[in-house]
């Protein structure tokens, strides 16, 4: 029996060695598998992180371009609005200037005409005074087919034949 015990002890020893060897091998394999999985996860994590960073950078760049485009469009719109307002203002100023110029020209022309008319009236009054002085205030009036000589107040007339014509002599 001792042989059997010895064989059993050897078998148990071999089984124990084999179990330890299998355990070591499995531990090594699990460790390598863990390292491989960890490496793969780290690699994927890096790839995902890089992809996210690239997407974020691309999105930020696109967003910045969009912002600049919108900003430029707004500035262009602002310039267009200011240009339109400036053109409208200049057109209004031009119209006001033309109205003032036309009004001033009209007033200047009418002022000249009034001045000329006043000068003409003054000349006519002088001529009338000269005529009144020469005619001693006698006026000629025509009423239809009849003609009259009107004497000034305080004067009387006497008809005198002279040189083949009838003359009117004024008396006071």
From Swiss-Prot:
Q: Disulfide bonds, which pairs?
A: none
Please provide the record's keywords in A-Z order.
Answer: Conjugation, Mobility protein, Plasmid
Q: Where is the signal peptide?
A: none
Q: Which Pfam families match?
A: MbeB_N
For the keyword Nucleus, the answer is no
**InterPro entries recorded:** MbeB-like (IPR006922)
At the top level, the lineage of the source is: Bacteria
Q: What does this protein do?
A: This protein is essential to promote the specific transfer of the plasmid in the presence of conjugative plasmids.
Q: Which family is this protein grouped under? A: To E.coli MbaB and MbkB.
Subunit structure, interactors included: Interacts with MbeA and MbeC to form the relaxosome.
Query: Can you say what this protein is called?
Result: Mobilization protein MbeB
Q: Which organism is it from?
A: Escherichia coli
Q: Which gene carries the instructions for this protein?
A: mbeB
């Amino acid at each position: 029996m001792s042989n059997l015990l010895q064989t059993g002890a050897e078998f148990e020893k071999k089984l124990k060695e084999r179990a330890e060897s299998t355990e070591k091998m499995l531990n090594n394999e699990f460790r390598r598998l863990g390292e491989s999985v960890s490496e793969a996860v780290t690699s994927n994590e890096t790839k995902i992180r890089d992809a996210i960073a690239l997407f974020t950078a691309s999105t930020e760049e696109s967003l910045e371009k969009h912002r600049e485009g919108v900003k430029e469009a707004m500035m262009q719109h602002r310039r267009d609005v200011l240009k339109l307002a400036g053109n409208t203002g200049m057109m209004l100023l031009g119209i006001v200037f033309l109205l003032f110029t036309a009004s001033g020209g009209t007033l200047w022309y009418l002022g000249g005409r009034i001045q000329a008319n006043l000068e003409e009236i003054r000349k006519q009054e002088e001529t009338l005074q000269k005529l009144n002085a020469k005619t001693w205030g006698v006026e000629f009036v025509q009423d239809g087919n009849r003609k009259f000589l009107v004497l000034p107040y305080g004067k009387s007339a006497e008809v005198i034949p002279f040189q083949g014509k009838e003359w009117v002599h004024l008396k006071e």
